[in-house]
Amino acid sequence: MEFARRARRLYPDREAVVDGDLRFTYAEFLERCDRWSSALQDLGVGQGDRVAYIAPNTHSHLEAYYAVPQIGAVLVPVNYRLLPDDFEYIINHCGAKVVCAHPDYIEAIDGIRGKLEGVEHFVALEGSGDDWIDYEAALATHSPDYKEIEIAETDLLTINYTS
């Protein structure tokens, strides 16, 4: 994570992320990551907890690659091309506490929601739905001051499933 902090310090106004019409500088992008870390901690996510993501390559998905591990949680990117039964298996097998989904996959997750044993929170990465946390609203209402924790180089960072 130090390389990201260094980039923010040295190049805060340099463009870092382009997602369609959205553009973020290093400072903007990493502040969003920090806000998401803070929001996750407020949801009770801590060291070793799994956060599953079902999304194509978007800025919010990229933010997860910084926000989740910097609080010691484990990122579980799920191949969005899979079927709902596969989503169910992966989410349950990894023990996800939070599921974050792009709007294209919310209906699929809602269809298996009752079978997702340990999931405590569902986050809509764009917009919101019934019983879904609005990602952008969570960023807007949280400080970038997350609680920093000690992370060892042997700590689990991500769980990747192959198809």
Give the label of every model feature segment.
Residues 1-16:
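A short N-terminal helical cap/helix-turn-helix that marks the beginning
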Residues 12, 159-163:
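Conserved adenylation A10 loop of the ANL superfamily
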Residues 13-58, 62-66, 83-88, 134-140:
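Conserved AMP-binding/adenylate-forming core of the ANL superfamily
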Residues 66-71, 93:
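Short hydrophobic alpha-helices that are characteristic scaffold elements of the AMP-binding
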Residues 78-79, 102-103, 126:
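Short beta->alpha connector loops at strand-helix junctions that form conserved
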Residues 82-111, 141:
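Conserved ATP-dependent adenylate/AMP-binding module captured primarily in the ANL superfamily
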Residues 106-154:
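ANL superfamily adenylate-forming
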